[in-house]
Amino acid sequence: MSDSQEIPYHNQLKNRFRGYFPVIIDVETAGFDAKKDALLELAAITLKMDENGYLHPDQKCHFHIKPFEGANINPESLKFNGIDIHNPLRGAVSELDAITGLFQMVRRGQKDADCQRSIIVAHNAAFDQSFVMAAAERTGVKRNPFHPFGMFDTASLAGLMFGQTVLVKACQAAKIPFDGKQAHSALYDTERTAKLFCYMVNHLKDLGGFPHIASELEQEKTTEKETAL
């Protein structure tokens, strides 16, 4: 169907999250302080909704990033994520290039989905959001598409749905393959988180959750139209 008007109200992405366009994000860093510690890797995946109302991963971007000038580098963090910031094969770009590329991809997806604003989806989302927002502020990139503080945290959602808050455990509960050797790669973790978020949203739909809510909204819209006639 090319005409979105032919697709049921609740099967359109713009109506699923109150006009928000969800974007899966994962970052790898040189510490925990978004203002002082270096952002070293960033990956993002947008989502799309099919005509039956199911979410799927869509576009992706991935950047290795050079530490900003004066950034703090915590050796323990590098040991944890295995990043060698001096390896020329990283192909690292500046924060400016990474944030610009991210925002461009997100704004295109947001426009195509007819959404009003984008929202970060991440595992322990406050951490990832803080680094994205700090980098956006440092670089001065305009037209930030993301809500300044709203977010969807898959750790909280997985805790509610599966009783699991660790990404690998939540993926296992959802029967999503997870290779521990690839963990702490921003792109791999983003891909797993995207699959996890889609699974949880789609599973709720299959259980009769969101369609029930949307049906009430559709009924209200129909009633309003009939009243206006």
Curated annotation (Swiss-Prot):
Q: Where is the active site?
A: 184 (proton donor/acceptor)
User: Where, by residue number, does Mg(2+) 1 bind?
Assistant: 26
> What does this protein need as cofactor?
Mg(2+)
Instruction: Say yes or no: keyword Amino-acid biosynthesis present.
Output: no
- Cofactor binding, per record: Binds two Mg(2+) per subunit. The active form of the enzyme binds two Mg(2+) ions in its active site. The first Mg(2+) forms only one salt bridge with the protein.
**Main enzyme class:** hydrolase
> Which NCBIfam families does the protein's record reference?
RNaseT
Q: How does it assemble?
A: Homodimer.
Read off the HAMAP family from this record: RNase_T (MF_00157)
Per its database record, what is this protein's job?
A: Trims short 3' overhangs of a variety of RNA species, leaving a one or two nucleotide 3' overhang. Responsible for the end-turnover of tRNA: specifically removes the terminal AMP residue from uncharged tRNA (tRNA-C-C-A). Also appears to be involved in tRNA biosynthesis.
Name-wise, this protein is Ribonuclease T
